Amino acid sequence: MRRTLVYGLGESGEAATRALLQRGERPLAADAASGEGPRRVLEELGVEGVLGAGPEVLDGVDRVVVSPGVRPRDAVLREARRRGIPVISEVGLGLELLGPGVRVAAVTGTNGKTTVVDMARHILRVAGVAHAVAGNSWRALTGCLEEVRRAGVLVLEVSSFQLHHLPPPGFEVAALLNVRPDHLNWHSSFEEYARDKLRVFGGQGPGDLALLSADDPICRRAAGGLRAEVVLVGEGETGVRDGRLLLRGEFLAGERELGFAGGHNLKNALFAAAAAARLGAGLEAIREALRGYRLKPHRMQVVAEEGGVTYIDDSKATNPAAVAAALLSLGGRPAVLILGGSEKETDFEEVLPHLGGCRAVVCQGEAGPRLRDFLSERWGGEVVLAGDLASAVEAARRLARPGDAVLLSPGCASFDQFSGYEERGEAFARLAGGRRAVRG
């Protein structure tokens, strides 16, 4: 019997190990760490395991299923490549175990993929189309295989980490929303990152659908070489014209009818509508769903209003492109911007043209000093350095004036102070002194 190593025992690694056990296989489970988390997984599963694993764990192994948190430069993965041992992602294993018969719409992109998946599932729910959702920000695919088989339709969010080790998947629908510099501490270069994003179109044929952003240069260059039917979202018959959202020339909704704002979110809605339509949602259901949709938390969400100042949680903005989109969506409203978090060494050059409406920028967290130095040199406005989010909110409160927004759009991950962007957003809401608002 083939011997599979599951390497990395986070949520996806645990789910992959369970799925293999349910198939009657006896995988080897391993993690480079040796802490309580991986140890608990091994005890619960009762599977052979190795903690503090090094390259020797590959002895007798025929393939490796790798968790997305493991970087390609990891010693075990380097040795696997040297030995010619196949390496696949947990998503790749999930697709293999699913087998044929499930229609899959896969969504990737630097920004917006979780929102597009959430919009698509909302549309499918309103349309009465049975479906399941998995991947990246959702459940591990290998942890919900039976549900996916029963539904027959899967909306799958895939990250560059998951695509890096994914064989050509042949998705019926593949969507690439945008490609901006991000995760360069994981990928060896931006070029590798972009190549991994484009792997979402691997294995597609003329009967499949490829959705790409019309205004993203990498998407436009890639579109001409794809075998699937290509729709460039944001121009022509699938775009926004005179404040009207159109899908293949059919009217969906006016901007003012929607419960969310921002050009990036309108485009997200078009991606979701195009994918859902291919999976069986009718036009009337799409129209109804979009008019009733509200964004998930931590995406340009108003969390407090105090003294004429509005506090906006955009904690999900973990790269510079997302910060630029957030500032653009303010429409020139004066703002105090809170930037910073854990360091990813990303270039904030593309944020500079959008700082015109900012009264000040507060830089905080691990990346704070670098961002302070960058902005002090390249931008003429007021720049303040704060040690952490709490002191950043206090500084922003002092700087803001009635009518301003205090915008948490960090452009960085959160792991210097928090377990994730959700915890960071909740902390911001508490520090701002308000409850979460219901609007957009």
Swiss-Prot record:
Please give one Gene Ontology molecular function term for this protein: ATP binding
Task: List positions binding ATP.
Answer: G109, T110, N111, G112, K113, T114, T115
Pfam families on file? Mur_ligase_C, Mur_ligase_M, MurD-like_N
State which gene encodes it.
murD
Protein function: Cell wall formation. Catalyzes the addition of glutamate to the nucleotide precursor UDP-N-acetylmuramoyl-L-alanine (UMA).
Choose any GO biological process term that the UniProt entry carries and state it. cell wall organization
Q: What is this protein called?
A: UDP-N-acetylmuramoylalanine--D-glutamate ligase
Tell me a GO cellular component: cytoplasm
Q: Which InterPro entries match?
A: Mur-like_cat_sf (IPR036565), Mur_ligase_C (IPR004101), Mur_ligase_C_dom_sf (IPR036615), Mur_ligase_cen (IPR013221), MurD (IPR005762)
Organism annotation: Rubrobacter xylanophilus (strain DSM 9941 / JCM 11954 / NBRC 16129 / PRD-1)
Q: Which NCBIfam families match?
A: murD (TIGR01087)
Q: Where in the cell is it found?
A: Cytoplasm
Top EC class of this enzyme: ligase
